[in-house]
Amino acid sequence: GASTSILVDAHPHIGTDKLPRVIENMRNTIIQCGGEVHFETRMDALLIEKDEVKGIETNTGKTFLGPVILATGHSARDVYRWLAANNVEIEAKGIAVGVRLEHPATLIDQIQYHNRNGRGKYLPAAEYSFVNQVDGRGVYSFCMCPGGFVVPAASGPEQIVVNGMSPSNRGSRWSNSGMVVELRPEDIEQFTIDNLQFTISMQHDSAANCQLPTVNSQLSMMYFQEYLERLCWQQGNMKQTAPAQRMADFTKKKLSYDLPETSYAPGLVSSPLHFWMPSFIAERLSKGFQLFGKYSR
């Protein structure tokens, strides 16, 4: 379903508008090869006998026996909670946390093509890639969406998560990318339990039928992620308007009194990200922004 240009492009791009057809074709290929796809079906438990996984039990009551691969993706947090509650060995992994930057596409074109007139008629919307080390942790751009949009991507209630997408023609007036800080489990060990209280303290997970682990557990990074997503929601007036700040104001630690036009449909609310974001993230982001500004000249 994608353009044939992905076979030769250095940075192949399918386009969000074409992804549904691509996914449908992938699903049909799996079925043609003898696989099955079960919609509206959730794994509720692993079937374990003598410390060996024998299969799964689903919300429909049906069981599937045989080897199991948990391809959980980004947000299947109920699976991780079940595993921790049932003594399946898992461990915390590093994550990357940050913000999404948005600029006029014409500005990025001018910078990257070194031409004040931009890209002209024949060149594609310009991309960039930024990677650096700040205080012993990586600060880098990812998922750069030239000619794209910033979109809401929360997977649960009382969360704000944003992502980027580009249509196949990369034709919007904006370009955006994630700018994130590398985090390791040891980075949040000193993060106060009070900040995570709403997530982990004396909660009862009905799906796992167990008491949730403490912050210093194999789920600590997941709880920290949930904390940040809810904090963003609170700072966004408890709806899907995203808290935002101009990059220059973030580095100067001052509130933005106005915000530029955005592709993010729910809208923005000015917020002092530098103040409420955990300092070990905000300080590295600030230094990264300053390096990015020099890189982008």
Located regions from the model:
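Residues forming the flavin
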Residues: G1-D194, I200-A208, P213-R297
